[in-house]
Amino acid sequence: MSTIFQDLVDSTVIKNAVQGQFTSLVSNNLVVSKVNSLHLFEIEKIQKDESSFPLDDSLQNEFSTSIIDESQAFMETNMHLIRTNEQTTYVLRLVSQVKVFGTITEISALKGKGSNGCDLLIMLTDYAKVSTLEWDMQSQSFVTNSLHYYEDVKSSNICSSHTPTQLLVDPDSDCCLLRFLTDMMAIIPYPANEDLDMEEAAIENSKISSSYAYKPSFVLASSQLDASISRILDVKFLYGYREPTLAILYSPEQTSTVTLPLRKDTVLFSLVTLDLEQRASAVITTIQSLPYDIYASVSIPTPLGGSLLLGGNELIYVDSAGRTVGIGVNSYYSKCTDFPLQDQSDFNLELEGTIAIPLTSSKTETPFVVLVHTSGQFFYLDFLLDGKSVKGLSLQALDLEINDDFLKSGITCAVPAGENLVFLGSQTTDSYLLRWSRRTTNEEVRLDEGDDTLYGTNDAEMDDMLDIYETDESVGSKRKIAYENGPLRLEICDVLTNIGPITDFAVGKAGSYSYFPQDNHGPLELVGTAGADGAGGLVVFRRNIFPLIAGEFQFDGCEALWTVSISGKLRNMKSRIQAQYSNPELETYLVLSKEKESFIFLAGETFDEVQHSDFSKDSKTLNVGSLLSGMRMVQICPTSLRVYDSNLRLTQLFNFSKKQIVVSTSICDPCIIVVFLGGGIALYKMDLKSQRLIKTDLQNRLSDVKTASLVSPDSSALFAKLFTYNETLNAKGQIANGMNDSASETDLDIQPNHKTSNNDQMGYDQSVSADDVPEVDNTIVTEKNVSNLDQESLEKHPILFALTDEGKLKVYNLADFSLLMECDVFDLPPTLFNGMESERTYFNKESSQELVELLVADLGDDFKEPHLFLRSRLNEITVYKAFLYSNTDKHKNLLAFAKVPQETMTREFQANVGTPRDAESTMEKKASSSVDHLKMTALEVVGNHSAVFVTGRKPFLILSTLHSNAKFFPISSNIPILSVAPFHAHHAPQGYIYVDENSFIRICKFQEDFEYDNKWPYKKVSLGKQINGIAYHPTKMVYAVGSAVPIEFKVTDEDGNEPYAITDDNDYLPMANTGSLDLVSPLTWTVIDSYEFQQFEIPLSVALVNLEVSETTKLRKPYIAVGTSITKGEDIAVRGSTYLFEIIDVVPQPGRPETRHKLKLVTREEIKGTVAVVCEVDGYLLSGQGQKVIVRALEDEDHLVGVSFIDLGSYTLSAKCLRNLLLFGDVRQNVTFVGFAEEPYRMTLFSKGQEALNVSAADFLVQGENLYFVVADTSGNLRLLAYDPENPESHSGERLVTRGDFHIGNVITAMTILPKEKKHQNAEYGYDTGDDFSCVMVNSDGGLQMLVPISDRVYRRLNIIQNYLANRVNTIGGLNPKSYRLITSPSNLTNPTRRILDGMLIDYFTYMSVAHRHEMAHKCGVPVSTIMNDLVELDEALSYM
């Protein structure tokens, strides 16, 4: 069997983060690492509306008192001061996202060690591979400077092979340290440039490259530092030392809670200084007899210095001289240690797993430490000083009166992210960018500032005001307030959504379609459990975007449509997009086009056709738009271009000659571009003074143009930076005068007077006098037009992007028609920059690769960036993201584009693929007079996004967010979409309208409740508790979820008595979980009913079972089965229960129609041991009880009767059924293949797995008539097994045979098989036939993955592609893609990874240039279209979701 492993949804958990200046010397970057990807963010300061920030009552009162009464005059004028509605905040903007062929363990930063003075990124992958990465501005990615490999190092400690690793960087970036194998340390020196070899630095005209900025590394054992150092717990570098100094926490003698009466305080703490030149070390001091439960140390920045030691029950500070001071945070510390501690046991904290982050800024005199508990609680620790020494510690909880309780679970990493910024990364909840401030009390503010509470509301705002208004007399008092360490306030600036860990999932009907029982063919969605603890909930995945249709009607013969907003007044151009949805004076028109006629309707509550207008209805319409910010409407027809005023009266008419066939058009206020067949191009520009179009023939400057697009420079800050930076380097005269109108007209052969004699402009234009054109009086300045004065007096000059027949991209600034960029684009290289040329080969002639359409548009939500879109003949969309890079020779910014990886196949399936040499004949068959229909449409506002809609048989919506690159989302539509346009109405705000091939026009709303920053759209539903299992009831169309919440735990015996009473008032009770079964409606995603289990009883497994309720009729009925565990402490045996629930119909609550279902308990059976898994087998209920598996029958619909059982391995964690075949996964003994029979009842053991595995999930995989088993273990490995008694390796069928194995890097938690959809069949090229299934799986890192069976022919082709890419792809960190997928455990196969292909590597095929694609296809002996068809088939395997 041949398969391919693919990622459907990227992992979302964040394991590590680091802040630095990676992209430039003035940037503030944050790099976060997920399982196998790096995300580089830019922390940007923006202004946001204050309404988006939740304020507590106290702050609201402060803000309300700061508003000045409008009745009070200001300086005896009519002006009044009011508080602005904008507030300064920070956001994370994604710069780059790269995949890594390795599991990222840790990352860190080397300050200032890059070739341009920027920081280097240090990445630790797998177990002991250290890579040095540097940001490359031209390729917009990280490049590898060095790779250090230490996995061959052996340790004398036999128990250290699976110990965690640590990656540390000295505060002065002098060296990097890797701790691995518990007590082994690899040190990589990074000296300053002046300390490098002088002979190397003296080379003429040479610069010291960062690639050689390190010296040879060396490995030390802990015993080489000091003979007593062993069993290291934690290592940190210390601040404030000239030489790199280590703080080592270790425990040579081990103890436990049981042996505390014999051995206490076994932890030691040593300060060791390193001599990198001599590779020597010296111990400065050692502190002994520290509490045994200390597990980590935190280095405190200067000026304080020292270390903070974290234990389960205490916090201890150690200064540079070895003096200690500590506190106990619960009542048990005195029983665990004899170390002297101050009593702060009222907190009742258990600090295991707590993350500590030291913070400091210019506003605080000394650093302080923020502690984040595993429950999500915040505490902060202040150091009480006596002179320069610390005399005590003060621990305080975060004041929830001035802070939101937003964190419901623990975090995994925390890093300072700039001045007063901190980033918290988590694996169980969302990650947050926070701004912190140590606010002063209101009393202190009033004492120093009187009644002025404006500066007391927010320290960040106060500093901004001080920078503007402070005087020498006021500096002292105001700065004194800023240095006061008052209560800590945390403000959420940005959130990175996390949906992991996912432990279970179910497939059900899409929520908004769930209450139509007569329709059983609605769209499906995948619903999984998300998060942990208080951050638990559900996550809803959909592969496609389902249009929410707000209205529809049929218009026979309609082929295209447009919407345009017209106003009779000149408005502010800068806010034209927002004004379209808020200005009541705007009128929106809908233009429909048939083959030979057009129609125009006034869009409102209804569509009313416009009568008595000059709008051309006797011709087909090619494009419609507006000019002069909505004052003019433009209609482009095959034979003419027409301009209308706000009353739809014709003001200008330009006729095209009969030989001029319009290929493409683009409208961008105030310009129009028309491209004709044969390469001709014409520019029409609106003159603001006369409000008339002026035509310019660009044939002398541009020729052989295939398609073109215009984009406004005002749409993005990128173009503003490009022009602003470059204009400052020009002559002052050019800056002052610019390119005035007359000069531009002279350069472009335009007549200064507007009475043109152009033959293309017909007589109708001559009959329109200048008096008939309404003019705007700019001489009168009023309150309404004062803000528009500058915009009205200046012209906008769009940027022209043109694609020529030779495949060249030319970019012009229409302000002076200067060439900004020219390069070859036909080869689709990874980056586009000025002057780039590609080598032409005979392969490039294949018609399917020919580019036929170009579009430049903005993508994004709150932050929009320009993108270049190129479409090939078979609808393959290539997206490039614009960026700027500096040219040091010319001292100017240059425009460039970087290719965005295509994660979804937009290309259409090409039937009847010919031979590899069919390209030339296909090109010859294509008539030169044909015109390709334009399919890409820019939607300026759809929901909260700027997007691009791709029409056709496979419609797509291309979206980008602040935290993601451009993503391709298929639109669910069985009928090809012909045309689309933005549309705004009361019932469809910021939506869109489209027409399909059946002439149905539909008005759609955009689903704002979904997130679009991953490969699939998803929606996170918070339930506020841990979710352990989920099942979907298909007839009632609701979800049953097993949940658990923590409560205080009391030890009781089997009779319920409390044998241990609490005698000490300072003692407190621990927490334990108790569970319930909740019914969740997919219509509102709320809990509509619950069943509470017994105290401390938690659900472990929830499943839908169709049980046989009649032996005569064999009738089956769906039930919800639940397996639970009852844990009451180590003194009482664990018990469990098997529950059976029926979902019944009831009268819904008033106003809540979703509450029409309730849970009804059918039966409960309690047994010894936990019930870890339940499932159905051929109409019977199966439950796994430890190592025993029991099959039960439902009798009389009220009780269960056991009919068969079997003893398996140690503890059954997974059970899957396929008819009467069963597959069980054990916690340590691999999988077991079992059969079940009814007459007589028996369970037969068929076969077992060969190796001892910790199985995390397992399931069947079907390909036609072949049956296989997919097994995932806790080490992140995936195995494909088969039952083959004829194979000698199976020992006559006693052992399952391994067909392939594959390292994933994630722990798979659940999997199931889903049908594989196949729409295309081609026997010649070996496409799949028969009934195939895909194995869909979820993992603990928030990802969704799939294992897809493929035919042998497809496997051979893609295997050649994989081997080619493994040697050609420039991998991040210098890692080998093939070695990453190898499993380290022994296997009987000579080639263990055979038959499982790496989808992440094969995805690079679409990223490669066209020439490389043809080279790979040539090695396979097939055309590129065949390879692309293979990828399309795989991409559409779950197209019904």
UniProtKB/Swiss-Prot annotation:
The keyword Nucleus applies. It is found in: Cytoplasm; Nucleus. InterPro entries: Beta-prop_RSE1/DDB1/CPSF1_1st (IPR018846), Cleavage/polyA-sp_fac_asu_C (IPR004871), RSE1/DDB1/CFT1/CPSF1 (IPR050358), WD40/YVTN_repeat-like_dom_sf (IPR015943). Keywords: Cytoplasm, mRNA processing, Nucleus, RNA-binding. It comes from the Eukaryota. Residues 741-763 are annotated as: Disordered. The keyword RNA-binding applies. GO terms for biological process: co-transcriptional mRNA 3'-end processing, cleavage and polyadenylation pathway. Belongs to the CFT1 family. PANTHER family: DNA REPAIR/RNA PROCESSING CPSF FAMILY. RNA-binding component of the cleavage and polyadenylation factor (CPF) complex, which plays a key role in polyadenylation-dependent pre-mRNA 3'-end formation and cooperates with cleavage factors including the CFIA complex and NAB4/CFIB. Involved in poly(A) site recognition. May be involved in coupling transcription termination and mRNA 3'-end formation. This is Protein cft1. It comes from Schizosaccharomyces pombe (strain 972 / ATCC 24843) (Fission yeast). The lineage of its organism: Eukaryota, Fungi, Dikarya, Ascomycota, Taphrinomycotina.
